[in-house]
Amino acid sequence: MTEVRCVLAPNPGPMTLEGTNTWVLRADVASRAVVVDPGPLHEAHLDAVSAAAGEVAVVLLTHGHADHSAGAEVFAERHGCSVRALDPAHRLGSEGLGDGDVVAVDGLEVCVVATPGHTADSLSFVVAAERAVLTGDTVLGRGTAVVAHPDGHLGAYLDSLRRLRDLAESAQVERIWPGHGPAIESALPVIEGYLAHRAERLDQVREAVASGATTPRAVVERVYADVDPVLWPAAEQSVAAQLVYLSGWG
């Protein structure tokens, strides 16, 4: 059994939903915890994570976006532990993270799965004992993830979704613990929905381009007309990634 706690950061918004989920994991009755995505540099939030975690063995980052990583160094220094991430710029200590790595702490095992696409450095973490995967921003608790050009790469993202789907189809993963939004108890239909949504959006972008839309903004005005305009700048970056993909470069 694994003790699992989610500490919600006070950073709600259109892109972060209710806020960033910081996950605290430990093997049942173990003394040391693994903390995934300490979140923003917000003192009260880091205090809440510390209270939930107790002794911390290591901090893991799903990716380097500030809403997940900005508080990591301060938090890790407070607990005297390392920060492990794919991108060396976000590490504290000499150990990184890569596909296939297993982080083992006092009976808890966290398996690293490379899931690039939302960002080049995106990772997911499988907790096999719970048949769960922590997905960061690759799959959210509600809505869909943004794949924003230039760091976002749609081809890689689709491959990552297929890899997560394979884990769900093989019953290695049944639930999703996301970086934002509520936990998902049935992973497979959500991942399949993400893939279907991306295919539908790509068809819509193709149609918009065929009908004369020549810029990301023009495509957004046609394809994302039902989306709150406050999200259009992010949608433009997403469309840019889709156009790169459709051009054969992404």
PLM features: what roles do these ranges have?
Residues M1-A52, S124-G136, G141:
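Conserved beta-strand hairpin/beta-sheet module of binuclear metal-dependent hydrolase folds
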Residues G143-D151:
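Surface-exposed cleft-lining segments at the edges of enzyme active sites
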Residues H42-E43, G64-A70, H90-R91, A120-S122, ...:
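Active-site environment of divalent metal-dependent phosphoester hydrolases
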Residues R84-P88, G136, G179:
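Generic beta-sheet signal
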Residues N11-G19, P38-C111, R131:
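Active-site HxH/HxHxD metal-binding segment of metal-dependent hydrolases
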Residues G155-G212:
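Divalent-metal (often Zn2+) His-rich catalytic cores of metallo-beta-lactamase-fold enzymes
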Residues E3, L25, D37, H63, ...:
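Divalent metal-coordination and catalytic microenvironments
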Residues E207-G250:
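C-terminal regulatory/interaction regions
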